[in-house]
Amino acid sequence: MSNNGSSPLVLWYNQLGMNDVDRVGGKNASLGEMITNLSGMGVSVPNGFATTADAFNQFLDQSGVNQRIYELLDKTDIDDVTQLAKAGAQIRQWIIDTPFQPELENAIREAYAQLSADDENASFAVRSSATAEDMPDASFAGQQETFLNVQGFDAVLVAVKHVFASLFNDRAISYRVHQGYDHRGVALSAGVQRMVRSDLASSGVMFSIDTESGFDQVVFITSAWGLGEMVVQGAVNPDEFYVHKPTLAANRPAIVRRTMGSKKIRMVYAPTQEHGKQVKIEDVPQEQRDIFSLTNEEVQELAKQAVQIEKHYGRPMDIEWAKDGHTGKLFIVQARPETVRSRGQVMERYTLHSQGKIIAEGRAIGHRIGAGPVKVIHDISEMNRIEPGDVLVTDMTDPDWEPIMKKASAIVTNRGGRTCHAAIIARELGIPAVVGCGDATERMKDGENVTVSCAEGDTGYVYAELLEFSVKSSSVETMPDLPLKVMMNVGNPDRAFDFACLPNEGVGLARLEFIINRMIGVHPRALLEFDDQEPQLQNEIREMMKGFDSPREFYVGRLTEGIATLGAAFYPKRVIVRLSDFKSNEYANLVGGERYEPDEENPMLGFRGAGRYVSDSFRDCFALECEAVKRVRNDMGLTNVEIMIPFVRTVDQAKAVVEELARQGLKRGENGLKIIMMCEIPSNALLAEQFLEYFDGFSIGSNDMTQLALGLDRDSGVVSELFDERNDAVKALLSMAIRAAKKQGKYVGICGQGPSDHEDFAAWLMEEGIDSLSLNPDTVVQTWLSLAELKK
């Protein structure tokens, strides 16, 4: 790739690959790598060219400006924000005032003429690509400039000059010093690429891994209307999608979760260049905010491209994509190694021990907890108010904020999604962040003490006061063998990918209640009879079901997503999903639920479980749950999902519920379907062999079994000290159940609280020959290791 014997000043993307990072920087080298190697595999990258590091170095050398730059940097205190700002501004002005050498200007002119030959009105993106950028140990997130909708050769030339100057942005100078890079060893390449008309469609960022947990079996995609800069900066709360890779590879529907973002604003082309700007920000019409910015087919298509890119690079990738509004085609406009998870880590578990008044909530970044006094920062001029340990509260951050972000104990923003700047840097620094809160800067007051918790799932909470929390560290690579399986109880799909990274042998209890309560929130009957509801209730439900075609589809679709997330997280290990076990008072608390539920004196012993499923008043609601399970197993192919029936009072009820399941298309044994029964009523143990005729095994619910064996209300504080699963009467019932299952060669596990709380009880169950213990995630490692010690 020589040019008249000297190093070329400009290279086309299709001449480049990853071995050219030192010539054109990580960003441009990666674009070249994809055009050269992945074009035939369905990965589309817009064409373009790059100026080389030689071109940049010659530009600085020939003008002599480099000497002045390095002298000024050597005598600047980088940690003094004022000094840094003054030096940075001076250096950037020197570069902008320096003319290009004629050879470089001509080389850019020739390449530009070729790239715009088919359309003289073509618009371009001009991006920076630093030669040290996108190395896996340094996330230069957004540290240099990007110019969009640049039209005409003169405008491209100006943009390239500004890109060169951006190597000396305050944040870039500060970052290099703190990461140990020598300023003299870093050069800049400008990439000039044809624009994808995503101003007329949507764009976003995707990762070939779950960014929060490091779980590598999903692609995580974010999307919003307009140009991608809004998502990258965190100026909008985007739509989010998770796609399961093994399901995608099997050519099945693979989207396991969709979350609609508010998408309030978008960046589009400015009709005329306003104030020298080629783009403008405008409000998104309400009807577009209320729908997803990608179709399911487009989400799957993007995920396929992400998988191809990850496979080619052999590592998790962070990818920017754009959809062309004219052609509908999806393009990849950037790909770099995903920085945070590439580092390797010790497993840390943060636990909040109490909860206070919630001041704000948004998207949780990471799984940590931080606490301290609030500092509301309205703009960058107030940066120096941040002291170490403060909770930084602001509208949104950009890379200029990095020097102070590392001082914060937590970060809270009004705007942004999980791929915004604040999120990327918070992960890198290991600081909890709650982004996209909407009005945190108004609700949180300077100086008040708060606790910021990201340890409770996808939603992050800001609580009033300093609350008590703890952190456990463990780095367990391989677990010792036991004569039983250690499984997990999981209710919240938001935490599934995180929990799947713990040592485990599947899920012994996945509860539907959390999904119905938190992801749906509406009584199933109120949805089935939507047209009969009061207008006010209809409006409330419409607001909740945005993104779904009908009330019925909202219930089935959300349940499907929740179950699929749990199934995908632990695939191919077994995931036993217990169908809904709400009591009548809990169903009544759902939106629209009051008119459909009986008022019972003791709901714990009332209308629940199997009896509810087969009753005329609930059968068609139960059918919705069955439909969701069928979609997960039959359409998506997640046949590791099994179902469990709670609170089966009589053998006749057992027979009736299994027949009802078959009527709904869930026939025992078909497509490998296993149906497990909760063994949680004394009658279940006393007549265990008869109950087992209808099921593939038992999962012991020790909470209800204890309550019913000892005649205790487990919700009553008055008798709570008598509640103990280790009571001999309870153990006698459990022994009967275990022996009966063993005799018939059927599965028997336990999913009650007992073995998580009492290691001696877990040890007794192991001696009894139980097949599995399903434990709370925070006790899995400890209980597993303790039982292994006993077996020695």
UniProtKB/Swiss-Prot annotation:
Q: What is its EC number?
A: 2.7.9.2
Pathway(s) served:
Carbohydrate biosynthesis; gluconeogenesis
Gene Ontology biological process terms from the UniProt entry? gluconeogenesis
Under catalytic activity, the entry for this protein gives: pyruvate + ATP + H2O = phosphoenolpyruvate + AMP + phosphate + 2 H(+)
Q: Which SUPFAM superfamilies match?
A: Glutathione synthetase ATP-binding domain-like (SSF56059), Phosphoenolpyruvate/pyruvate domain (SSF51621), Phosphohistidine domain (SSF52009)
* Annotated InterPro entries: ATP_grasp_subdomain_1 (IPR013815), PEP-util_enz_mobile_dom (IPR008279), PEP_synth (IPR006319), PEP_util_AS (IPR018274), PEP_util_C (IPR000121), PEP_util_CS (IPR023151), Phosphohistidine_dom_sf (IPR036637), PPDK_AMP/ATP-bd (IPR002192)
> Which residues does UniProt mark as catalytic?
421 (tele-phosphohistidine intermediate), 751 (proton donor)
Gene3D superfamilies according to UniProt? ATP-grasp fold, A domain, ATP-grasp fold, B domain, Phosphoenolpyruvate-binding domains, Phosphohistidine domain
Pfam families found in the cross-reference section: PEP-utilizers, PEP-utilizers_C, PPDK_N
Q: Which cofactors?
A: Mg(2+)
Residues noted as binding Mg(2+) in the record, renumbered to the chain:
680, 704
Q: Which UniProt keywords apply?
A: ATP-binding, Kinase, Magnesium, Metal-binding, Nucleotide-binding, Transferase
**A GO molecular-function annotation:** magnesium ion binding
Q: Which positions are annotated as binding substrate?
A: 511, 578, 680, 701-704
| Regulation of its function | Activated by a Pi-dependent pyrophosphorylation and inactivated by an ADP-dependent phosphorylation on a regulatory threonine. Both reactions are mediated by the bifunctional serine/threonine kinase and phosphorylase PpsR.
Q: How does it assemble?
A: Homodimer.
Q: What does this protein do?
A: Catalyzes the phosphorylation of pyruvate to phosphoenolpyruvate.
Q: Which family does it belong to?
A: Belongs to the PEP-utilizing enzyme family.
Give the misc comment.
The reaction takes place in three steps, mediated by a phosphocarrier histidine residue located on the surface of the central domain. The two first partial reactions are catalyzed at an active site located on the N-terminal domain, and the third partial reaction is catalyzed at an active site located on the C-terminal domain. For catalytic turnover, the central domain swivels from the concave surface of the N-terminal domain to that of the C-terminal domain.
Fill in the domain comment.
The N-terminal domain contains the ATP/Pi binding site, the central domain the pyrophosphate/phosphate carrier histidine, and the C-terminal domain the pyruvate binding site.
Identification of the protein by name:
Phosphoenolpyruvate synthase
Q: Which gene encodes it?
A: ppsA
